[in-house]
UniProtKB/Swiss-Prot annotation:
PANTHER family referenced in this protein's UniProt entry, alphabetically: 10 KDA HEAT SHOCK PROTEIN, CO-CHAPERONIN GROES
Compartmental location: Cytoplasm
HAMAP family xrefs: CH10
Subunit structure: Heptamer of 7 subunits arranged in a ring. Interacts with the chaperonin GroEL.
Function, in words: Together with the chaperonin GroEL, plays an essential role in assisting protein folding. The GroEL-GroES system forms a nano-cage that allows encapsulation of the non-native substrate proteins and provides a physical environment optimized to promote and accelerate protein folding. GroES binds to the apical surface of the GroEL ring, thereby capping the opening of the GroEL channel.
Keywords (A to Z) from UniProt: Chaperone, Cytoplasm
GO cellular component: cytoplasm
Family the UniProt entry places it in: Belongs to the GroES chaperonin family.
Entry superkingdom: Bacteria
Gene Ontology biological-process entries: chaperone cofactor-dependent protein refolding
Organism name: Shewanella amazonensis (strain ATCC BAA-1098 / SB2B)
Molecular function as annotated in GO: ATP binding; metal ion binding; protein folding chaperone; protein-folding chaperone binding; unfolded protein binding
UniProt name for this protein: Co-chaperonin GroES
Broad class of where this protein is predominantly found: cytoplasm
Source species taxonomy: Bacteria, Pseudomonadati, Pseudomonadota, Gammaproteobacteria, Alteromonadales
Amino acid sequence: MNIRPLHDRVIVKRLEVESTSAGGIVLTGSAAEKSTRGEVLAVGNGRILENGTVRPLDVKVGDVVIFNEGYGVKKEKIDGQEVLILSEMDLMAVVD
């Protein structure tokens, strides 16, 4: 299935991180802290400004981003894979 976000929305696949406890035990699943880094899978056309022009997004497909998993983030399953649909405003940084 293809998915195309609208306007300033971005589709992100969460990147898994390996968490280790203070005692050296590798934590997985619900015991591990969820990553706030992800890979951009798709981007919308851009934010519509008050004057009607469209400002392109600052991120592109393939970028690794740090995001804020707040109120506006929507979790979806696409082809059996969990993805996040969020606004560009929920992105905090691009990791180079």
